Amino acid sequence: MEQYHGTTIVSVRRGNQVALGGDGQVTLGNIVMKGTARKVRRIYNGKVLVGFAGSTADAFSLLDRFEAKLEKYQGNLTRAAVDLAKDWRSDRALRRLEAMLITADRDTTLVITGNGDVLDPEGGIAAIGSGGAYAQSAAKALAENTEMAPKDVVEKALTIAGELCIYTNTNFVIETLE
């Protein structure tokens, strides 16, 4: 069976602002199945941003579990992420899920992987997905050499990734927190 490919998710934090954005392309083999998928969401009463890459069904399953962990830990992003990663790593069914998440609240940005990793990215920039390396490189260059707002850095980084990665389009959803 062919694998779904695609997605670029990038987050930039500067000062008291954080932006998280993603493209809208879902690809099956060499066919674009959808160009307007929404892979970035606000959860926990709009206080937490989350973006996902990987298998869509797996990502939604993890998103539901992550929301439950946020409720359990009263919005403590780090505790919720670590608990989700522990479950993801130790549960046989969850271990098969193929997705990654970037989560952000007013204070913290974390990357959560299926390997049980919870990573606090250096420099306030994180990116995942097929175009993640392009977006992260562009975001890093822009953040270090301009005074652009995080939302603008995310938009430009996604644009560059969309120009270089065949699994990334230029239909973006970008959310911000201040």
Curated annotation (Swiss-Prot):
EC class of the enzyme, as a word: hydrolase
Sites where the protein binds Na(+): G162, C165, T168
MF-aspect GO terms: metal ion binding; threonine-type endopeptidase activity
SUPFAM superfamilies documented for this protein: N-terminal nucleophile aminohydrolases (Ntn hydrolases)
Cellular component, GO, one term: HslUV protease complex
Subcellular location: Cytoplasm
Keyword flag Nucleus: no
Single Gene Ontology BP annotation: proteolysis involved in protein catabolic process
Keywords (A to Z) from UniProt: Allosteric enzyme, Cytoplasm, Hydrolase, Metal-binding, Protease, Sodium, Threonine protease
Coiled coil: none
Regulation of this protein's activity per its record: Allosterically activated by HslU binding.
Claim: Protease is one of the keywords in the record: yes
Catalysed conversion reaction: ATP-dependent cleavage of peptide bonds with broad specificity
EC number: 3.4.25.2
Active site: T7
Physiological role: Protease subunit of a proteasome-like degradation complex believed to be a general protein degrading machinery.
Family named by the database record: Belongs to the peptidase T1B family. HslV subfamily.
Oligomeric form and interacting partners: A double ring-shaped homohexamer of HslV is capped on each side by a ring-shaped HslU homohexamer. The assembly of the HslU/HslV complex is dependent on binding of ATP.
Protein name from the UniProt record: ATP-dependent protease subunit HslV
Native source organism of the sequence: Cupriavidus necator (strain ATCC 17699 / DSM 428 / KCTC 22496 / NCIMB 10442 / H16 / Stanier 337) (Ralstonia eutropha)
Lineage: Bacteria, Pseudomonadati, Pseudomonadota, Betaproteobacteria, Burkholderiales
Gene for this chain: hslV
